[in-house]
Amino acid sequence: MTDVVATNQTILVVGGGISGMTAALEAAECGKEVILLEKGPSLGGRVAQLYKYFPKLCFPTCGMEINLRRIKGNRKVRVLTMAEVTAVSGEAGNYNVSVNIAPRYVKESCTACGDCGKAVETEFADEHNYG
């Protein structure tokens, strides 16, 4: 049996909730390069939607602010929002991951004619229940 040693030891964390942010920070503080992937436009996940959370019954901003500052200050963490994993290949220790990143802006060539709105469906998922 041959052990595979990856030459690129970048860690991909999928999900930018509190757990994902914490996992990314812990790995980065151990010296690893980390890519934190979130499908939504911002980090925080369900906790960001809460009024207060257990055990201290504090507002989500108090706990999230600390993690967001740590992420911002850590050069080993790269955050990709509005991104989804489309394919994974490889084997343990050596994966290739394809990521689709959604656009964040309207191009300058847009004339606001309304054709784009007609071309796409207007059904939206229930964003509070993730589906």
Residue ranges of model-derived segments:
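Iron-sulfur cluster-binding cysteine motifs and their immediate structural context
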Residues: A28-S42, R46, S89-A92, N96, ...
